[in-house]
Amino acid sequence: MAQTFFFYDLETSGLNPRQDRIMQFAGQRTDMDLQPIGEPYNILVTLNDDTLPSPDALMVTGITPQKTVEEGYAEAQFARMLSEEIFTPDTIAVGFNNIRFDDEFIRHLFWRNFYDPYEWTWKDGRSRWDLLDVVRLTRALRPEGIEWPIDDKGEPSNRLELITKANGIEHENAHDALADVTALIAVTKLIKQNQPQMYDYLLKMRDKKLVQKLVNVDDKKPFVYASGRYDKEFAKTTVAFPLTTSRNG
């Protein structure tokens, strides 16, 4: 089976994947040339009566508990859809900060509904890719051909809505999951068109075995590393050096 991307985004009732819940899910499958396959998904998920969204979530998304009850799928039904229709074999799940945020909500969703919480990101040719780190490394190392935004404080910013605005990409209704997915695909195309070698290299580096060859305590060499822990002054990127393994190996 040919590999495909599935770009997705969530709107949630809060920031804690253990306690909070998914309210909106949107996604679009594409081929490896980023051309759409089929229709996009844009669905609400019913919040249980014991889930109280944070005020910030309500203000940012505009999604109320009442709306999820009226229009949403039951969480168990949604989990089945993800498992059987969306995160199918040979799917590369793609998001923006998904490894640290969205993927954790999906894992906890599967766990609550008696699905394996990890297989959807590795089994049968599946994998995942976080475009936030791709954006960080492209900005730091291969910025040519792309307009990189500055926020209202005069500091570099990699917020999706600012990148789209700086590059003339339509992105109305930021923080609506489907609008964010459409914008993310457009930004991915922008990077692929302007920095194809960087794009191809970083796509390959979603494979942890290739990363392990770079970050190898038995053959120590410096490597370039991007992370939100680093300062904006250095484009969230640094040169790191492996010293020892963590207790997790």
Question: What does each model-identified segment do?
Answer:
Residues 7-9:
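Short hydrophobic beta-strand that contains or immediately precedes a catalytic carboxylate
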Residues 60-81:
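Metal-dependent phosphoesterase signature
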Residues 11-18:
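Short acidic, Gly/Ser-rich segments with clustered Asp/Glu that frequently serve as metal-coordination loops
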Residues 189-249:
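Acidic two-metal-ion nuclease catalytic site recognized across multiple nuclease folds
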Residues 14, 81-85:
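A generic secondary-structure signal
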Residues 20-25, 29-63, 85-197, 202-203:
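Metal-dependent phosphoesterase core characteristic of DEDDh/y 3'-5' exonuclease domains
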Residues 1, 86-88, 247-248:
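Flexible, charged surface loops at secondary-structure boundaries
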Residues 1-4, 209:
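N-terminal accessory regions of nucleic-acid-interacting proteins
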